[in-house]
Amino acid sequence: MVDKRESYTKEDLLASGRGELFDAKGPQLPAPNMLMMDRVVKMTETGGNFDKGYVEAELDINPDLWFFGCHFIGDPVMPGCLGLDAMWQLVGFYLGWLGGEGKGRALGVGEVKFTGQVLPTAKKVTYRIHFKRIVNRRLIMGLADGEVLVDGRLIYTASDLKVGLFQDTSAF
């Protein structure tokens, strides 16, 4: 039985990475350094732009985060692909929250637009995921649109984020 809370702490997210939050059959979040959020502040089965589910999560920014030291030397910026991965992570987390079982895999994205950047001087990144559809058949899949904000300003959008849960990934 999934503990369907509306919010999750960093400790909860780390437990998900160890397979302890949604049980061993549920999807796992990655462990640090690839875990791209510090907390989930809202999860609902309704709401969002399509009234089919909504997730909001946050990442605290500080200049010591690992990616600022290598991307780029003398011009530190959070790689845009990490924001995209965070959105995929949240789609998979939501599928586990709904009770889905399997190993989460990103399946694609329709379009991504970058209109800003995350610098080491920022304070907080906010991720917003608006679910469009959940497929619960042989393959469990989530389809959503996402937004990334830095200190309240919209900087990335993604349409048609797709994540599936697989019982067997050997042929994937």
Swiss-Prot record:
Q: Which GO terms describe its molecular function?
A: (3R)-hydroxyacyl-[acyl-carrier-protein] dehydratase activity; trans-2-decenoyl-acyl-carrier-protein isomerase activity
- Give the record's keywords alphabetically: Cytoplasm, Fatty acid biosynthesis, Fatty acid metabolism, Isomerase, Lipid biosynthesis, Lipid metabolism, Lyase
What EC number(s) does its UniProt record assign? 4.2.1.59, 5.3.3.14
One GO biological process term: unsaturated fatty acid biosynthetic process
Q: Mind telling me which GO cellular component terms the entry cites?
A: cytoplasm
Cite the Pfam families for this sequence: FabA
Catalytic residue positions = H71
Q: In which pathway does it act?
A: Lipid metabolism; fatty acid biosynthesis
The chemistry this enzyme catalyses reads: a (3R)-hydroxyacyl-[ACP] = a (2E)-enoyl-[ACP] + H2O; (3R)-hydroxydecanoyl-[ACP] = (2E)-decenoyl-[ACP] + H2O; (2E)-decenoyl-[ACP] = (3Z)-decenoyl-[ACP]
Q: Where does this protein reside within or beyond the cell? A: Cytoplasm
- Asked if the Swiss-Prot or TrEMBL record annotates the protein with the keyword Cytoplasm, the reply is yes
Q: What does this protein do?
A: Necessary for the introduction of cis unsaturation into fatty acids. Catalyzes the dehydration of (3R)-3-hydroxydecanoyl-ACP to E-(2)-decenoyl-ACP and then its isomerization to Z-(3)-decenoyl-ACP. Can catalyze the dehydratase reaction for beta-hydroxyacyl-ACPs with saturated chain lengths up to 16:0, being most active on intermediate chain length.
**PANTHER family from the UniProt entry:** 3-HYDROXYACYL-[ACYL-CARRIER-PROTEIN] DEHYDRATASE (PTHR30272), 3-HYDROXYDECANOYL-[ACYL-CARRIER-PROTEIN] DEHYDRATASE (PTHR30272:SF8)
Q: Subunit info?
A: Homodimer.
- Could you tell me what this protein is called? 3-hydroxydecanoyl-[acyl-carrier-protein] dehydratase
Source organism per entry reads Escherichia coli O6:K15:H31 (strain 536 / UPEC)
